[in-house]
């Protein structure tokens, strides 16, 4: 198949993407590019909740 892609280099400029998920490891070194843009908020009535599977990290990196 073709490996050439043609796209407007300004595509997506000025847009925002919001990811709402559990278990985002905001300190992951793969997110250095977005370190100032990641907002982590817990709405749990039970204090800090640890999501050991961290599926949000995978979602954010996609």
Swiss-Prot record:
Subcellular location: Secreted
Origin species: Fusarium culmorum
Triggers of expression: By gluten.
Domain Peptidase S8: 1-62
InterPro entries registered for this protein in UniProt: Peptidase_S8_Asp-AS (IPR023827)
GO CC entries: extracellular region
GO terms classed as biological process: proteolysis
pH curve summary: Optimum pH is 8.3-9.6.
Protein name, entry field: Alkaline proteinase
Temperature optimum or stability note: Optimum temperature is 40 degrees Celsius.
Activity regulation field: Inhibited by phenylmethanesulfonyl fluoride (PMSF) and chymostatin (CST), but not by Bowman-Birk type trypsin-chymotrypsin inhibitor (BBI).
EC code(s) of this entry: 3.4.21.-
Active site: 21 (charge relay system)
Similarity comment: Belongs to the peptidase S8 family.
Gene Ontology terms for molecular function: serine-type peptidase activity
